[in-house]
Amino acid sequence: MTELTRIPLAGVIGLPIAHSRSPALHGYWLKRYGLKGHYIPMDVAQADLRDVLAAMPRMGFVGCNVTIPHKESVIGLADIVTDRAALIGAANTLIFRKDGKIHADNTDGTGFTANLRQNAPAWQPQSGPAVVWGAGGAARAVIAALIEVGVPEIRLANRSRARADALRSDFGAKVHVHDWVQAGNILEDAVTVVNTTSLGMVGKPEFRVPLDALNPKAVVTDLVYAPLRTRLLVEAEAAGCRTVDGLGMLLHQAAPGFERWFGVRPEVDEETRAAVLAT
């Protein structure tokens, strides 16, 4: 097969990978835009990660998405790491360059911001504090994005105080750490509220942070998208808040990689959303 006739391959690697909506999303975009290409989900064990990444370009892959548990590990295997991926400490998008180098990026933060801009167009993040629950990889991406858009203060609460303190050390004085027992007490006057934990996800413990102090002018978003309408979003909506579910972040974070791999910037719209939800 010559270079001219090679059909580009992309995919997603993780363990397990069966839950991923990425194949449905990228498959939909390929069909929508009439593009030649394939997007393949692959279960990859940690012990095989280095060998798999080395083999993928030879098999015709132009890049891949990365999900749990490999998002941190691929940083050390990439030749080029973007500043934002280095700051977050994880990558979700790899590009296999023609010169043989692996380029690692993290688009979670831009996906988060784009989701709120699209679904809460009146959102003004610079107008007041943000509350972030959780201190894992998703929280790091969200905090980096919030700082970039000018949030003046980030109130962070996590079930493990040590992880939150470590995150503050990396991101600086805008981040104020609070004990988890205070998670509901830091909501007053916050204009952005984000759950980055797995609380409320199908099969996980319920989200039980009291929301009495919630600012009705806040935009509240939950990165959990299974279920789509989490307890947090239902209660926040009842309190008068604008709510944004987590599916849009998944859709928006995928667009930059698709463009790099297949040459078309895909639209994230209601048709895209419906196609993914139908799978």
Swiss-Prot record:
Residue sites binding NADP(+) per the record: 83, 134-138, 223, 246
Keyword field contains NADP: yes
Cleavable signal peptide: none
Gene Ontology MF terms in the entry: NADP binding; shikimate 3-dehydrogenase (NADP+) activity
Cellular component per GO, a single term: cytosol
Family: Belongs to the shikimate dehydrogenase family.
Subunit comment: Homodimer.
UniProt-recorded name of the protein: Shikimate dehydrogenase (NADP(+))
Provenance organism: Cereibacter sphaeroides (strain KD131 / KCTC 12085) (Rhodobacter sphaeroides)
Gene name of the record: aroE
